[in-house]
Amino acid sequence: MALIRLVAPGRVFSDLASMVAYPNFQVQDKITLLGSAGGDFTFTTTASVVDNGTVFAVPGGYLLRKFVGPAYSSWFSNWTGIVTFMSAPNRHLVVDTVLQATSVLNIKSNSTLEFTDTGRILPDAAVARQVLNIIGSAPSVFVPLAADAAAGSKVITVAAGALSAVKGTYLYLRSNGLCDGGPNTYGVKISQIRKVVGVSTSGGVTSIRLDKALHYNYYLSDAAEVGIPTMVENVTLVSPYINEFGYDDLNRFFTIGISANFAADLHIQDGVIIGNKRPGASDIEGRSAIKFNNCVDSTVKGTCFYNIGWYGVEVLGCSEDTEVHDIHAMDVRHAISLNWQSTADGDKWGEPIEFLGVNCEAYNTTQAGFDTHDIGKRVKFVRCVSYDSADDGFQARTNGVEYLNCRAYRAAMDGFASNTGVAFPIYRECLAYDNVRSGFNCSYGGGYVYDCEAHGSQDGVRINGGRVKGGRYTRNSRSHIFVTKDVAETAQTSLEIDGVRMRYDGTGRAAYFHGTMGIDPTLVSMSNNDMTGHGLFWALLSGYTVQPTPPRMSRNLLDDTGIRGVATLVAGKATVNARVRGNFGSVANSFKWVSEVKLTRLTFPSSAGALTVTSVAQNQDVPTPNPDLNSFVIRSSNTADVSQVAWEVYL
């Protein structure tokens, strides 16, 4: 009679070495390893990938760890085993130990990597390389479009059978057309990643419906083509911690902390990434803490960066819908950099589109706190702050960047700046404090400055066109608004200055017009501005060889007293002491101007005539003229007029 084992024997081991050396495991065995890295195992003779954490090779077969939920780094005997475990998709690993990286850790689709308070990854001691990779790949085969696809379209066409696209497939479109987000494309060509939502074929042509509209025109004349990339999808990194302060005197170099390429739905939160740069030193090896290249729907939240050679978060290629929230970057080149790819080693495609930075902070950056490098579209920063940057606080080098309620403190150059050829950044409710050159510099291509404040700079706003509306400016040593061009070939455009509070506070002029750079004041309009206290000296001019025509002026205030009242005409005339002012000379670097006096008749006697202002006179007392003794005459066309007339003085 055959004997049948009814109860599997229990095999308990106190250490890993004795367990993996045991020679007599059988399939039914119940196997237990004691200790912090212990657990329950099953034995199998089926070939399995060994990672020395969840799968061990033993005599005659393999031990498989029994677990539900994440694996733990403390289970693994070495870094190579962790790399092996994470090389497959659908993985969840908790880093609960200090790991010494000896190679790149590649993370695949549908995976999560999270760190406990004691979990760390220390960069490779021997080779400077990336630490964590979420890397897909570009298509290996492209097919041409069957027809032009216009910007705004959500449909492309290819020849029937040319592309094996089905619902859910990612597509990578590109052409030889150049990116258009900024003034200098550096030769980078257009590209986008889209997802297929439907496919239909008729008459030898396959129509592919896309999840989002195209941002560019894809023309056959520009060799527009499409392929299927390999995307890494749905990856989450929770509290990633790379390197340590003072670890081996910060000599553990890495090129990129977390590198993503052709990835979708990548989310990084609450991390710490420490670079190798000595405090305050210039750029060194170690480009970026986090790099997104050709990624879609990515987020970074609550992550800190220290001593990074270049960038905290770098976004380039056709990355789209990237959001960065609540990061803190200390002693990096830029906290956030939207970048172009170098074409020195061949063609490159794609610019960042739809980028949003919210509640981000940059401290002591070696260059601008936040930068957009020449290309990119629909870029926005909200409630971000730059402190003590060695260049500008914020630098816009692509068109139409929008800043909402951001702040710049003590930048070595401008608090907020654009660059050559950049058109019309938008600033709303932003604050600039104690920046060396200016609070806002829009003098490279114009800009819009709405309800902002600048205090303690040489100039509050440098600008050559656009609009400055609302806001408050104080303690700016030369001027509150400097109308100039930082580059001679930049075209001056019309400029509206409206409703700005720029009272005299002991330093600087309200406005400065830079004739040296060819500024034409007639392209400027100034209205409803509070320039109280500046008096005759509200404007500074330089570089003009003949007296220029002043800007268009309306309802500006130079004083807060002696500027309104009521006069009663006697025999059709009244002399009024008021703070009327004017400059009647013809000196080149000055404007010829006189106060505007608005008259409103309050009574209407039968003798009422047409009212005019004549004989504006300024007190000439020496050494200090008294503006309260300035005067003007209200005169009626009817010498019998005895009307009461309200008067208001403006510039």
Curated annotation (Swiss-Prot):
InterPro entries: K1-lyase_C (IPR056204), Pectin_lyas_fold (IPR012334), Pectin_lyase_fold/virulence (IPR011050). GO terms for cellular component: virus tail. Its EC number is 4.-.-.-. It comes from Klebsiella phage KpV71 (Bacteriophage KpV71). SUPFAM superfamilies: Pectin lyase-like. Gene3D superfamilies: Single-stranded right-handed beta-helix, Pectin lyase-like (2.160.20.10). Keywords: Degradation of host capsule during virus entry, Degradation of host cell envelope components during virus entry, Host-virus interaction, Lyase, Viral attachment to host adhesion receptor, Viral attachment to host cell, Viral tail protein, Virion, Virus entry into host cell. The keyword Lyase applies. GO terms for biological process: adhesion receptor-mediated virion attachment to host cell; symbiont entry into host cell via disruption of host cell envelope; symbiont entry into host cell via disruption of host cell glycocalyx. This is Depolymerase, capsule K1-specific. Pfam families: K1-lyase_C (PF24146), K1-lyase_N (PF24145), K1-lyase_Rider (PF24149). Belongs to the K1-specific depolymerase family. The lineage of its organism: Viruses, Duplodnaviria, Heunggongvirae, Uroviricota, Caudoviricetes.
